[in-house]
A protein has these predicted regions:
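Membrane-embedded transmembrane alpha-helical bundles that form the catalytic cores
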Residues: 1-471
Length: 472
C-alpha cells in the first residue's frame, strides 16, 4: 500500500487513526501492530510468514541474550542466531539469485536460479536493519530486551516507517512504546499533519512531476508519453537535463516519503529521527553523506564503522573501514553491479576528501558546492543505470561523449518553471518562509489546507506512482 494513493489517504489512514485514538491506553500498541500487519499484507500477503519469523527470531533471541547475561558463550550464540536469521532472509530474497548469476557469468558455472523469489518483500532492507540493531543493542546492554511480543511487533512493523524508513532503532521509540496514557499531544498531532502534508506535496507535486521529465527524456519501454525521446535519440545536453531531473525526483520522492512517515509517527505519538537535511546544499561529498539518508548512514557508522575501529586506528585503517561501509552501502541498495560500482565510487571520493581534499573544500565558497553537485549527479547516473531499461553504458557515453540529437529547449520551455521551483525547494528557503507563515494561525492553517487539497487532487487524477525506494 502506497501512502500517496486514494485507498491509503481516505480509507486505511483515517480508519487506523480512529481505531488507535479510540482504543484503551493498554491496547494502543495492539491496534498499531494489527493495523500495521494489515498494511503490510495488503500487497505482500505471501510474505507474511517472513515478517512473523523475523519478529519471532529477534524477540526470542533478545530474551535469551538478556537471560544468559552471565554466560558470554550463550549470549554470543543467540546473537548469532538473530544475525543469521535476519541477514539470512535478506540474503535469500535479495541477493541469492544475483550471486548465482554473477558466479555463472564470472566462473562459467551453470547454477540454476532459485524459483519463486523474483519479487523482493517490500521494505525488507529497512526492517531487517531495525531488527539487527535491536538484537545488537540488547547484546551490548544498550537496551533491555522487550518482553511483550506485541510491543516488539509494533516496533518492527509500525506502518509509517515499515516500507522505506526512516530506519528507527528500538531505543529511539522504546520509551514511547511504553507510554500508554497521554502518548500524544495536540501539538504533536498538528506537527504530524503538517509534516505529512508537506511530504505528500513533495511526492505528488514535485517528485512525480519532475519524474515525468525524466521519463519523457530517457523513456521506458511502455511509456505512454507523446514526447517520448529515448536515450539513443537524446543529445548530450538533453541527457544531462534528464539525469538532473532524476536527481531531483529521487530526493523529493524519498524525502517526501520520510517526511510523511515521520509525520504519521508524530500522529501516533512517536518521534522518528530525521532522514534528510538539504543534502543538495552540501559543499563536500563528506557533508552530503551527513545530510542524505541519515538513518542509514548512522546505522552503518554505529554498527559497522565504529566496531571496525572508526577513526581510532590510524589513517590506513580509516580508509579500510570507509571501504567496507561504502561497499555495504552500495550492496544494501540493490543486488546489481551498478549499485556496487556506486558504492565504490563514493568510497573513492570520500577517501580522496579524507586524505587531502577536504581541507581545500572547507576554504572555498562557491566551487565546493558545484563540485559536490556534479559528482552527486554523476553518482545518480550510476544508480539509475541498471536493469530498469536504462542502459548503463549508453547513459555514460551520452553524458561524457558529446553527441547530437533531440535538443533540450522544448523540455526547458515546458518544465523550466518546475525545475526552478524544485531547485528552490532543495534549499532551506522554503523552511524559512514556512517559519514566517506559521506564526499566524490563519496563514498556517490555510497553507496546509491548500497544499493538502491540491496534492489530493493530483492523487485522484493520476495513476499510482510507487515511491522509488520501495525497490530497495
Amino acid at each position: 500500500m502506497v501512502f500517496s494513493t486514494i485507498i491509503f489517504l481516505f480509507r486505511f489512514l483515517p480508519i487506523t487513526l480512529a481505531l488507535y485514538y479510540l482504543a484503551p491506553a493498554k491496547l494502543k500498541n495492539t491496534v498499531l501492530f494489527l493495523c500495521s500487519l494489515v498494511f503490510y499484507c495488503w500487497g505482500e500477503v505471501r510474505f507474511f510468514p517472513v515478517m512473523v519469523a523475523l519478529i519471532l527470531i529477534n524477540y526470542i533471541s533478545g530474551l535469551c541474550i538478556e537471560h544468559f547475561d552471565q554466560k558470554p558463550a550463550l549470549r554470543r550464540t543467540f546473537l548469532l542466531v538473530a544475525l543469521i536469521g535476519s541477514l539470512g532472509m535478506l540474503f535469500y530474497f535479495k541477493y541469492a539469485n544475483f550471486v548465482l548469476r554473477s558466479a555463472n557469468a564470472l566462473l562459467g558455472t551453470a547454477f540454476a536460479e532459485i524459483q519463486g523469489i523474483g519479487t523482493l518483500p517490500l521494505g525488507i532492507s529497512f526492517y531487517t536493519f531495525q531488527t539487527l540493531s535491536y538484537s545488537i543493542d540488547v547484546y551490548r546492554r544498550d537496551v533491555k530486551a522487550e518482553r511483550n511480543i506485541i510491543d516488539f511487533g509494533a516496533y518492527v512493523v509500525m506502518f509509517p516507517q515499515l516500507i522505506a524508513g526512516p530506519i528507527v532503532k528500538y531505543r529511539d521509540v522504546s520509551n514511547q512504546l511504553h507510554v500508554y496514557r497521554h502518548r500524544y499531544s495536540l501539538q504533536q498531532l498538528e506537527e504530524g499533519m503538517t509534516l505529512f502534508t508537506f511530504g505528500l506535496a513533495k511526492k505528488v507535486l514535485l517528485a512525480d512531476a519532475i519524474g515525468a521529465l525524466w521519463t519523457d527524456i530517457i523513456g521506458v519501454a511502455d511509456s505512454p508519453s507523446t514526447t517520448f525521446v529515448g536515450l539513443a535519440n537524446a543529445s548530450t545536453p538533453l541527457v544531462w537535463l534528464g539525469i538532473i531531473a532524476y536527481s531531483l525526483q529521487l530526493y523529493f520522492d524519498f524525502s517526501g516519503y520520510s517526511m510523511m512517515g515521520i509525520g504519521m509517527g508524530k500522529m501516533l505519538g512517536f518521534d522518528f529521527p530525521a532522514n534528510f537535511n538539504y543534502p543538495y546544499i552540501s559543499a563536500s561529498i563528506t557533508e552530503f553523506w551527513r545530510r542524505w539518508h541519515m538513518t542509514l548512514s548512522g546505522w552503518f557508522r554505529e554498527y559497522v564503522y565504529i566496531p571496525l575501529g572508526g577513526n581510532r586506528k590510524g589513517l590506513k585503517r580509516q580508509i579500510f573501514n570507509l571501504f567496507v561501509v561504502e561497499l555495504l552501502t552500495g550492496i544494501w541498495h540493490g543486488a546489481n553491479w551498478n549499485f556496487i560500482c556506486w558504492g565504490l565510487y563514493y568510497f573513492v571520493l570520500l577517501a580522496i576528501e579524507k586524505l587531502f581534499l577536504l581541507q581545500y573544500l572547507q576554504k572555498g565558497k562557491v566551487w565546493p558546492h558545484i563540485y559536490t553537485l556534479f559528482l552527486v549527479v554523476v553518482g545518480w547516473a550510476m544508480f539509475v543505470g541498471n536493469d530498469t531499461g536504462v542502459s548503463f553504458g549508453l547513459l555514460f557515453q551520452k553524458l561524457f561523449v558529446p553527441s547530437g540529437g533531440v535538443s533540450p529547449f522544448y523540455f526547458l520551455r515546458n518544465y523550466g518553471v518546475l525545475l526552478a521551483v524544485s531547485v528552490v525547494c532543495c534549499t532551506p528557503l522554503i523552511e524559512k518562509l514556512w517559519n514566517m507563515l506559521r506564526r499566524r494561525t490563519l496563514t498556517r492553517v490555510a497553507t496546509i489546507l491548500v497544499l493538502l487539497v491540491v496534492s489530493t487532487a493530483y492523487v485522484v487524477g493520476s495513476t499510482n506512482s510507487p515511491f522509488l525506494y520501495f525497490n530497495f
